[in-house]
Amino acid sequence: MKNNLPIIALDFASAEETLAFLAPFQQEPLFVKVGMELFYQEGPSIVKQLKERNCELFLDLKLHDIPTTVNKAMKRLASLGVDLVNVHAAGGKKMMQAALEGLEEGTPAGKKRPSLIAVTQLTSTSEQIMKDELLIEKSLIDTVVHYSKQAEESGLDGVVCSVHEAKAIYQAVSPSFLTVTPGIRMSEDAANDQVRVATPAIAREKGSSAIVVGRSITKAEDPVKAYKAVRLEWEGIKS
């Protein structure tokens, strides 16, 4: 990760929608996230188009499979020139290590390996869901911290977690370990389907390394204005 800009979640169905959304930003440097919907619709071409626009790019596919499959997939993703990719920590240490090896093998000579982070628990997951549906008796915070330690031991660069776990994670891992936190909303915005949410200011106070912001920007009447407001709050600058 080259900078600390808010990461904009490009939750659109097509390249056409995505590029139309980005047009008002002109050539402003941006850090964007491409998820499953957009990547599965457009494939590697959307990555190429966004890199041509000079965007830093988080490819959010949350790989979770047997180690060999994840290793081979990461080799392919590394060749695309993305900056940040992820796996599910629940896949275990062997899978995470295989993912890292795949990235290292697939990164073109002379290029920097994409950063690799692991999803701990989705921000839509609550304590109740963990206990009743996933049959996990440990608390959510204990599970997230455990997954974070496993990710660091596997050589990964960080994790995806909610803002509310960031401080506890840093009591268990090194200061350079990344905590990428989705579920970010401005105070006036609805939480929608996410449970563990926070504002950019709270994320900064809790020690998040990076924030991922979707609907507060993409659904705003003026996305550029909304992005600037998020960025100022994230940077601790009063508008």
UniProtKB/Swiss-Prot annotation:
Keywords: Decarboxylase, Lyase, Pyrimidine biosynthesis. SMART domains: OMPdecase. Pathway: Pyrimidine metabolism; UMP biosynthesis via de novo pathway; UMP from orotate: step 2/2. Signal peptide: none annotated. It holds the Pfam family OMPdecase. It comes from the Bacteria. GO terms for cellular component: cytosol. PROSITE patterns: OMPDECASE. InterPro entries: Aldolase_TIM, OMPdecase, OMPdecase_AS, OMPdecase_bac, OMPdeCOase_dom, RibuloseP-bd_barrel. The active site is at K62. It catalyses: orotidine 5'-phosphate + H(+) = UMP + CO2. Substrate binds at residues 11, 33, 60-69, 123, 185, 194, 214-215. It is an enzyme of class 4 (lyase). GO terms for biological process: 'de novo' pyrimidine nucleobase biosynthetic process; 'de novo' UMP biosynthetic process. One of its GO terms (molecular function) is orotidine-5'-phosphate decarboxylase activity. Gene3D superfamilies: Aldolase class I (3.20.20.70). Homodimer. PANTHER family: OROTIDINE 5'-PHOSPHATE DECARBOXYLASE (PTHR32119:SF2). Belongs to the OMP decarboxylase family. Type 1 subfamily. Catalyzes the decarboxylation of orotidine 5'-monophosphate (OMP) to uridine 5'-monophosphate (UMP). This is Orotidine 5'-phosphate decarboxylase. It comes from Bacillus subtilis (strain 168).
